[in-house]
Amino acid sequence: MTPSQWLDIAVLAVAFIAAISGWRAGALGSMLSFGGVLLGATAGVLLAPHIVSQISAPRAKLFAALFLILALVVVGEVAGVVLGRAVRGAIRNRPIRLIDSVIGVGVQLVVVLTAAWLLAMPLTQSKEQPELAAAVKGSRVLARVNEAAPTWLKTVPKRLSALLNTSGLPAVLEPFSRTPVIPVASPDPALVNNPVVAATEPSVVKIRSLAPRCQKVLEGTGFVISPDRVMTNAHVVAGSNNVTVYAGDKPFEATVVSYDPSVDVAILAVPHLPPPPLVFAAEPAKTGADVVVLGYPGGGNFTATPARIREAIRLSGPDIYGDPEPVTRDVYTIRADVEQGDSGGPLIDLNGQVLGVVFGAAIDDAETGFVLTAGEVAGQLAKIGATQPVGTGACVS
């Protein structure tokens, strides 16, 4: 059996025990328990950022946040059950007690499944625990709960998921969707010395954005697409009011003239930018093709990362703000180690042509990255001539 199946069995077992408790507690006790779970989870999500912000280790931060939420959820549920049982004791009529018990079973099942879902959601964004994230993402039971959850309820764990997303990259897939992984050979390490890397390096720039509303400095990569124009990811400049492009070691002030959070693409106007533009490939890449990711991982030095195309797919998932309404994009999945800071960088073929724009990495598979295809971003090229500044929306998290 898979870890996901064991997780489903565990959740259903706890739900069965909860159903017995619901029979004894009755409808009111179970409803109060449900209210206690929601209040406990909400309190945990509100308190967690202030408490775990003092913890530097990502793994310790994850488990500290989950322990806090679990403790408050348990306190809320127990308080609700105790209050409910006190009221139930006043019901003497046997038929009414029977109806009360049946309703209690149903409500208590909802309580436990909701609590399990609330605790599992942050784990789907934990890059520090890829095996655990994979098990949670593969859970059929939790996936059904996620489908049934109302939009307002999904905002409760969303804040904590953003806090615990240590990858620095926005979620690409729905919380309980597994990354599609087509097996391909390991990338060729010799690609870093291919002459095409040195030839394209000047046109790949580092981007630093100041987002004072969320007290963040955002770092990513971009590349020249026409004279004085740079393409990058929207999440690299989200919420910013000051953007600087670095060509080599020289800084250039930039203005965001196009911002699309659905596709996750932004275009920057950068006057007097000297590097020449890169050219987009006319033909799509095939599975197994040698390719290279160019970027500034971690906001550090220019790095060429060997990669290999897994497949080209139509991928459905959230936009950069995690909107519940999914967007569908043409994407390459690649075998490569994509890191924070690579966002917005080009994926090039061995002719130096751009196959797409890097925009994410898989949580449940450390060797898989996501790239918007050249065809997907082609529509954005119509905005190259824009000159007026546009808004950059809210901060991503």
UniProtKB/Swiss-Prot annotation:
Keywords: Autocatalytic cleavage, Disulfide bond, Hydrolase, Membrane, Protease, Transmembrane, Transmembrane helix. Disulfide bond increases the proteolytic activity by stabilizing the protease in the conformation in which the active site residues are properly positioned for substrate binding and catalysis. It is found in: Membrane. GO terms for cellular component: extracellular region; peptidoglycan-based cell wall; plasma membrane. Pfam families: Colicin_V, Trypsin_2. It is a multi-pass membrane protein. This is Serine protease Rv3671c. The active site is at H235 (proton acceptor), D264, S343. Its EC number is 3.4.21.-. It is an enzyme of class 3 (hydrolase).
